[in-house]
From Swiss-Prot:
Organism whose genome encodes this protein: Thermococcus sibiricus (strain DSM 12597 / MM 739)
Protein name: NAD-dependent protein deacylase
Originating gene: cobB
PANTHER family: NAD-DEPENDENT PROTEIN DEACYLASE SIRTUIN-5, MITOCHONDRIAL-RELATED
NCBIfam families, alphabetized: PRK00481.1-3, prot_deacyl_CobB
Gene3D superfamilies attached to this UniProt entry: SIR2/SIRT2 'Small Domain, TPP-binding domain
Reaction catalysed by this enzyme: N(6)-acetyl-L-lysyl-[protein] + NAD(+) + H2O = 2''-O-acetyl-ADP-D-ribose + nicotinamide + L-lysyl-[protein]; N(6)-succinyl-L-lysyl-[protein] + NAD(+) + H2O = 2''-O-succinyl-ADP-D-ribose + nicotinamide + L-lysyl-[protein]
Matching PROSITE patterns: SIRTUIN
Deacetylase sirtuin-type domain ranges (all copies): 1-253
Compartment list: Cytoplasm
Amino acid sequence: MIEEAPRIIAHSRFLIAFTGAGVSAESGIPTFRDRGGLWENYRIEEVATPEAFRKDPNLVWSFYKMRMKIMKGAKPNNAHLALAELEKMGILKAVITQNIDNLHREAGNQHIVELHGNIYRVKCTRCDYMENLLESGKLEDFLKEKNLPKCPECASLLRPDVVWFGEPLPQEALQKAFKLAERADVCLVVGTSAQVFPAAYVPYIVKDNGGSVIEINTKESGITPIADVFIRGKAGEVMQSLLVKVKRCLENKKC
């Protein structure tokens, strides 16, 4: 069954990837679960919610600046690079990710839907101001600044442009993801437990429309029962192996 995966990918008409924290684990980015849900003895709910930000924005910004530094030092791993290569080959049409680390973009993917935001983007709590600090070249100065970040247009407090616990997903990104899923005939699920809805509907939409679902995970998940192919393993190792086999499959017309 596992050997079917390269053929399914190679012959796909509209392949999408749905990725989660497992993709970035090999880049050294810790997840909340890795640390037992704690940061500096604070529960994650105390630093990653709207209530926490209203109560103590300094604490929340300390947490997110720490995460920015960690993610800034991380590099795309073999899973990111394989997905970027599949897009370059014209096979992968889009990456729908729950990650905020920007690594898909750094690896070279162009068509990305970020369901949970981007760690390097800030937005105003009052007006429509938004800025990607990495792209604008202001990240280093931002990380050194001791004072709370203020909006350059209205002087209100800036916040990370990420989805906090208890917040809905951005509708524009979610609708874009669903539309891509409706067009897809194959969904490659990589490194996600797919427990958070409505984002986790993505592979179900593909399956309901008669498409195939290929899951790559270190353990079975909520997606496994609907997966046509389940491959157990680390995302980087499996994706690199798959990429080689897909290329071989395309070269061999009988595949």
